[in-house]
Amino acid sequence: MKRQSILFVRSMWVVILFTTLAACKDTDNRVFGDDFEFPALTDENTIRFTVNVVGDWRQLDIVASGGRMVIDWGNGRIQKIEDPSSMSGGVVYRYGNKGLYEVRIWAEELQLIDISGLLLPLSHLYLGNMPRMKSLALNSISDTRELDLNTFCPNVESINIGSFADLEHLEIEDCFRLRSIQVYSNPKLTSIEFGSHPEAESLYCSYNGFSSLSLKSLPALRDIDLSSNEVLSHLELNEKTSISAILIQGCAFQSITDILKCCPSLRELSCSYNKLTELDQI
């Protein structure tokens, strides 16, 4: 009788164990966060980059707003965020182990995202479809030679692209809604093809590798900062532009006569450390 009781108890434990395992199988413990359905994460609908956790700092912060987002942290964990703007300081994730992690972010509903590799090294950035994106900030990312904003975020209004060690090509000519353009500290970026940007009022493009720029397709420009483009010697402006400030110090201009002719409303000019033999008369 006692033996039968022991066998019965063991049988019950086996049943409980299998029931528990079945329940775990039905619940994907890799996925955590808010409760909503999301599409399969593909190259077409995600932002993708590599995180290199090499030191004691293992925390990655991503600021976003405007819609739902899903992040595959690259270690088997997927986080769903209904409202990322409600998270103070952004979405924060801390990696447990050192290593390389391939991160994917579903961002089709987002209107703003800020990704930076300043504290944790990021590389190999690729963009996916972001039709609602209005404000895009990408900083301190290596091993990325080109970015195509035309295809993936054509409705963007503000861009902040900085400190890309290897960026050579940036496509923004079809982003017609651009108002603010900040592209800086990209030493290998030698040219930008500006399309028609009728609403762009500010251009901050310092510390790049430009030798020549044409801004004729930006008629609404008010403020221009092209400082510290060490080989920049030629600049074309729209004659109908009411520019109030131009900063071109630390460039290679030999003359700024043509620039000044296009700026009858100019209030601020900084042109030190160029190759000017004498200051052109205004």
Feature names for model-found ranges:
Residues 5, 15, 70, 191, ...:
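Generic short N-terminal amphipathic or hydrophobic helices
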Residues 1-8:
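N-terminal secretory signal peptides that target proteins for export/translocation
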